[in-house]
Amino acid sequence: WEEIGGFDERFVPAYCEDSDLAFEVRKHGCKVMYQPKSVVVHFEGVSNGTDTTSGQKAYQVTNQKKFLEKWQQELQENHLPNAVDPFRARERSVHKKILLMVDHYVPHYDKDAGSRTVYQYLQLFVNQGFSVKFIGDNFFAHQPYTDALQQMGVEVLYGPYYAKHWKDWLKENGKDIGYVFLNRPHISVKYIDAVREFTNARVIYYGHDLHFLREKREYELTGDAALLQSSADWEKKELELILAADMAYYPSYVEEQAIHEIAPQAKVKAIPAYLFSDVEECEYHFDKRKDLMFIGGFGHRPNVDAVKWLANEIMPALVKKLPDIRVYILGSNPPEEVKQLATENLLIKGFVTDEELQEYYQNCRISIVPLRYGAGIKGKVIEAMRFGTPVMTTSVGAEGIKGAESILDIADEAADFVEQLAALYQNEAELVR
């Protein structure tokens, strides 16, 4: 305020001084923030009347001319005439790259790992100066998640109108969209043809994991022939999407290698699944920690199977070795078949907030990941490492992490898992290393 000299006195006694202040603030390298949820009550004419030809109100016309004269170059270079191309004009997007992100719904960043990934990439694109639009395939304004995106600066398309007319919106604005980021095969397949038809955008496909690989592994575990057919169907769909996109990304080198084995020509690269900018060094105090934890959203079948295997094959033997042990099962939407597994030693807690989850990471001695099948890098493993909590996992849980053998304890058979976990739980030197 002092650096720019407050309000410009050329706008005395009133009108345009606030707009001028915003332009001056930007000129000096700062940002002007707009809060769309604020409410302004304005009684037109109460202060200075409504006649722009006399009295104080006349300064409204006079000062608009002064404002235009002062900022003529800025307005010509970075703004558009009134009512011309509002899609580009709003958010001062004349020179911004516009990116459309598509997923199944607005990211529930505190409920599942995939949503956390999408949310963090949205943050990245906004911070990089993109004008970001978001379509959730269910077109529902889940809260508080929709508000969180809007406060970030993301335009979210939701409601019955967009559910019915999203193709019209894409056709009308597609010429300005430079990038389209499609998530998950079952969602991307609905949108990629329209994106190609109505835009010239570079299309990025992010698969999260390989569905065909996950279902093939589940078939190998269960022998369910329907899963083998489903795996073949997914492989066809996923390869079509990968080859149709300009670039496909996955969260680890495992998916990259698997795709290149069956489609060497595919443009596929591994990128980080998570973007943590606030990683703090964590102190591990053995005596202040106890018990075990498992975190996973239960809309994901491998997590349900993991808890069932834990309860039926691991817990009985583990409790014999560690009678006072408690295992906290955390994660959204646990089904009845999981809730019914609860015992004195196995506590089904369900959904926890990010703050509560961090407390579990900081208070539990070990985070366990007893996954028997799945595909892709596991967010629960990366998250535990972020908080400095030791991890006991299967090889499925360790997949995609280079050097996993040196930083994780890994066992695949129930008996081996119990032996290693019980020994690790009591080994202070190993846990604090």
What is each PLM-predicted segment?
Residues E2-G5, R10-V41:
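A short, conserved alpha-helix in the catalytic core of glycosyltransferases
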Residues K27, K31-V32, G49-I98:
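C-terminal, non-catalytic tails of nucleotide-sugar-dependent glycosyltransferases
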Residues H108, A201, Y205-A232, Q257, ...:
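Acceptor-binding helix/loop patch of EC 2.4 sugar-transfer enzymes
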